[in-house]
UniProtKB/Swiss-Prot annotation:
Coiled coil: 100-216, 350-381
Keyword terms: Coiled coil, Cytoplasm, Cytoskeleton, Dynein, Membrane, Microtubule
Assembly, per entry: Subunit of dynactin, a multiprotein complex associated with dynein.
Stretches for region Disordered: 15-39
Composition bias type Acidic residues, residue spans: 24-39
Cellular component GO terms held in the UniProt record: cytoplasm; dynactin complex; dynein complex; membrane; microtubule; vesicle
Protein name: Dynactin subunit 2
Pfam families assigned to the protein according to its UniProt record, in alphabetical order: Dynamitin (PF04912)
Native organism taxonomy: Eukaryota, Metazoa, Ecdysozoa, Arthropoda, Hexapoda
């Protein structure tokens, strides 16, 4: 029987039960297999490679200091941050050493420079973005050079650097021992590695000797090349060797004879200048001219621009002078016109006065004529 609370509602079947059960669907209609529509363009199909995904996230781990809340604050709250690689950092509560800081900064700068070079090679980037990348690359390169030229032995002491190097060497030895225990040693491989390591050590020793002889800083090399008048170090060495070849005994005799001839010529020139008697005043004037030229040397660079500007302003100055002349002529004509107007005004006042007087006389004569006409009319009657 239907619920009595629905008895006053319309369209309610009171003679039927309140609960209805649908029959169970067949298994053919409840299959979990989803048949895609291959020809439907509205469905976006993503082709994801499991191998590429595995290689992308291989060796990465998640940090535990995360915050997924949406609270507002000064600190930016992010989720998990995936990081890769092995870092030899200081432990929790331990202070980072200067050597660890230096190595970490070098590694980060190398990674940043690699990312910038990769982004510069991208063809989709605009010229402005590439220019900004180049500026950042230059700044990072200079910072890297400064970091490489930093002498830790002078800054923090040779003992601290030696202790850091000893700890690094001990860690390396422990890793080598663990590797030897885990993997069987191959004699051929170890021999080649020893040859390579000895060769690398020899090259590093030669590089160190070259840096000691020439200098590790690029400023010294550029100063040497600039003083020698060469573009690179090889040309500077060649020019220095050529100059050193001139200092041989055979060349020194030739140089001495040439210098003797030059001294004789200089003495003859001094005698001629003393004979003319124009030495004191002439040298004084030459010195004054030289001082004037020296003082006006910074203005010489601005003179071409000033001349060009004066040439461009010449037409404007001519137009201004013509305008001033026309304005003066206009003032003179205006003054003459004002004088003519004043004289015409006086003449007009005189004409008006004469016209008024003549009009008054005419009126008097007309009155007299009227009176005579009246008298004549009376006589005629």
């Amino acid at each position: 029987m239907a619920d009595p609370k629905f008895q006053f509602l319309p369209y309610i079947a009171h003679d039927q039960p309140d609960v209805y059960e649908t029959p169970d669907a067949p298994e053919s209609e409840t299959s979990d297999f989803y048949d895609e529509e291959p020809a439907n363009e509205s469905i976006e199909r993503l082709h994801i490679s499991t191998k590429d995904s595995y290689n992308k996230f291989k060796g990465k781990y998640l940090t535990g200091n995360v915050d997924f809340s949406d609270r507002i604050g000064k600190k930016i709250r992010n989720g998990y941050d995936a990081v890769s690689g092995e870092w030899d950092l200081a432990g929790e509560g331990e202070k980072e050493t200067p050597i660890q800081k230096c190595l970490r900064l070098q590694c980060e700068m190398n990674e940043l420079m690699e990312e910038i070079t990769a982004s510069q090679a991208d063809a989709t980037k605009t010229k402005e973005e590439k220019a900004s990348y180049e500026a950042v690359f230059d700044v990072v390169g200079t910072a890297k050079k400064v970091l490489e030229s930093l002498k830790l032995e002078q800054a923090i002491g040779s003992e601290t650097v030696a202790m850091g190097a000893e700890t690094e060497a001990k860690k390396l030895l422990t890793k080598i021992e663990e590797y030897k225990k885990s993997v069987g040693a191959d004699p051929a491989k170890t021999a080649t590695e020893l040859v390579y390591s000895s060769r690398i050590a020899e090259l590093e020793h030669r590089l160190h000797e070259l840096e000691v002889a020439v200098g590790a800083k690029p400023e010294k090399i550029s100063r040497l090349a600039g003083s020698a008048g060469a573009g690179n170090l090889i040309e500077a060495v060649q020019s220095i060797s050529a100059k050193a070849a001139l200092l041989q005994p055979q060349q020194l005799d030739l140089i001495e004879t040439r210098l003797g001839n030059l001294l004789l010529k200089m003495a003859a020139i001094d005698e001629k200048s003393a004979a003319t008697g124009q030495d004191a005043n002439r040298e004084q004037k030459i010195l004054e001219l030289y001082e004037i030229a020296k003082t006006t040397e910074p203005i010489v660079q601005i003179l071409p621009d000033m001349l060009n500007r004066m040439q461009t302003l010449e037409s404007l100055h001519k137009y201004a002078t013509n305008f001033s002349k026309l304005f003066a002529e206009l003032e003179t004509t205006q003054a003459s016109i004002l004088k003519g107007i004043a004289s015409n005004k006086t003449l007009l006042t005189g004409v008006q006065e004469a016209f008024a007087q003549n009009l008054e006389n005419v009126n008097k004569e007309v009155k007299k004529l009227d009176e005579r006409m009246k008298t004549l009319q009376e006589k005629v009657k």
